[in-house]
């Protein structure tokens, strides 16, 4: 069973969102998603300054098995990316909820967070997979 931290919010497309408390939100892919993908070989991240809409493709995770689009769980401006992943994409596998984060977004409308799942609801969606 995948680890699903209760303090995070989740998109049904397997991204997680952590509120940093300053109007920005850190985004990554869930442990479940990285388990499905397998060993990461490359992560393509958005550019700092990019504006994204909720549900928009904004990054790509490439593994030994497949390339998978990553969607913005909320809309806003990309304010930081995890540059460490350029040289160490496998960090997504080893620490999906920590050092394997992908990007940070300044939310344009925090009410979009209400459309995301809590840990229990996300767990129920992956149980159905």
Swiss-Prot record:
Domain Lipoyl-binding intervals: 24-106
SUPFAM superfamilies per record: Single hybrid motif
One annotated Gene Ontology cellular component of this protein: glycine cleavage complex
Domain of life (superkingdom): Bacteria
InterPro entries: 2-oxoA_DH_lipoyl-BS, Biotin_lipoyl, GCV_H, GCV_H/Fam206, GCV_H_sub, Single_hybrid_motif
UniProt-listed Gene3D superfamilies: 2.40.50.100
Keywords: Lipoyl
Cofactor binding description: Binds 1 lipoyl cofactor covalently.
Cofactors required: (R)-lipoate
Modified residues (N6-lipoyllysine): 65
A GO biological process held by the record: glycine decarboxylation via glycine cleavage system
NCBIfam families: gcvH, PRK01202.1
Assembly, per entry: The glycine cleavage system is composed of four proteins: P, T, L and H.
Role description: The glycine cleavage system catalyzes the degradation of glycine. The H protein shuttles the methylamine group of glycine from the P protein to the T protein.
PANTHER family in UniProt: GLYCINE CLEAVAGE SYSTEM H PROTEIN (PTHR11715), GLYCINE CLEAVAGE SYSTEM H PROTEIN-RELATED (PTHR11715:SF3)
Similarity comment text for this entry: Belongs to the GcvH family.
Name of the featured protein: Glycine cleavage system H protein
């Amino acid at each position: 069973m995948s680890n699903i931290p209760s303090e995070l919010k989740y998109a049904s497309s397997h991204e997680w969102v952590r509120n940093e408390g300053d109007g920005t939100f850190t985004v990554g892919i869930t442990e479940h998603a990285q388990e499905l993908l397998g060993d990461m070989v490359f992560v393509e991240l958005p550019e700092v300054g990019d504006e994204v809409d909720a549900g928009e493709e904004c990054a790509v995770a490439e593994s030994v098995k497949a390339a998978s689009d990553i969607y913005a769980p909320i809309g806003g401006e990309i304010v930081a990316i995890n540059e460490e992943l350029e040289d160490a994409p496998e960090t997504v596998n080893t620490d999906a909820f920590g050092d394997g984060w992908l990007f940070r977004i300044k939310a344009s409308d925090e009410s979009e967070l209400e459309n995301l799942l809590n840990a229990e609801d996300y767990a129920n969606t992956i149980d159905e997979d």
